[in-house]
C-alpha cells in the first residue's frame, strides 16, 4: 500500500517537474526566439563609435518588444557586451533576442545597397554617399578634393570623379572613406575591361579622357540611341583641332545647369571648362557619365557631322549638320521655338 502511494506521488512529482520544465522551455523560447521587432517589420538601428550600452538600449527600446529587450539585456550583462560594442547597421526583425544579440556581439551587421548615380558634381556624389554611409558629406569632400588623395588613386582634383562608375554596390554602414575609395577604384578597374580600354586607346583617349567626353555626351541628351552619333560629332571636331563648343561645358563652368539658352556673353567666360574659349577636352568630366554614354564614346558612329542643335520640336533629339551654314539654319529654328514658348 505504501509502495503504491510512493509510486503515485513520484509519478505526480514527475508530472509537476515536467510541466515546470515545459513551461520553462516555452518561456525561454518566447524570450529568446520570438520576433524581436515590435512592429512586426524589419527595422534597422545604427550603432555609432561613440555609443555606449545605455544609448544602445535606448535605440533598441524604440523597435523591440519588451520581453526580447529584457532577454537581450540579460545576455549583454553575462557576456560583457558593454565592453565590446561594435558600430554598424543592425537588423531588428523576425529573429529572436538570442540571434540578434549574437549579431550585435560579433559585429554581424546588415549591408547597405549604395547606388552611384550619374550626378553632376562631387558635391552631389558626396551628398548621396553620406546619406547611406557613416561618414559625412564634408569628410568625403575633403578627401575628394585633396591633392594627396587624388594622386594616390592616379587622378587629379579635376578628374577624380572619373573613378566613379554608375551602379549599385554593397557596403557596410561603418565603411571608412579609405575603404570606400578603394572599393570604387576596384570597381572602376573591373568596369574598364581590356576591351573597353583598348577601344579608348584606339580612339585616342585615356580612360579619364573617354569619361570626360562621355560626360559631355550624357549632358547633351537622354536619348541613348543618339549618343554614339553625338560622340562621333565631337570626335570629328577634336580630330580637326576645332573647339568642341559644347554648351554643357559652359553651363558647368558658370554653374547654370538648368539654362535653356546659351547667351553670347557667356562664351567668353574664362574657365578651363569653357570649350568655346579653350580647345580640346576640359580638365575633367562635367558629371559622372552613364554607362551608355561611356560606351557611346568607345563605339561612336563614324560620319562627317561637325555641328548639332536641339530640334525645335523639343523631342530631346538633335539636328546634325556638316557645315556652319546648315547649322545656322537649325539654330535659328530652335531659337524661334524657344521664343515662341516664352523660354528665356
Where are the regions a protein language model picked out?
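N-terminal Lys/Arg-rich, disordered targeting/topogenic segments
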Residues: 1-11
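Non-catalytic interaction surface on structured domains
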Residues: 3, 15-17, 42-43
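Hydrophobic, aromatic-rich alpha-helical transmembrane segments
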Residues: 10-13, 327
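A generic signature of intrinsically disordered, low-complexity regions enriched in glycine/proline
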Residues: 13-17, 33, 251
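Hydrophobic membrane-insertion alpha-helices, especially the h-region
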Residues: 16-31
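Signal peptide-directed extracytoplasmic domains
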Residues: 37-192
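Bacterial extracytoplasmic/cell-wall-associated proteins, especially those involved in peptidoglycan
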Residues: 127, 133-138, 149-344
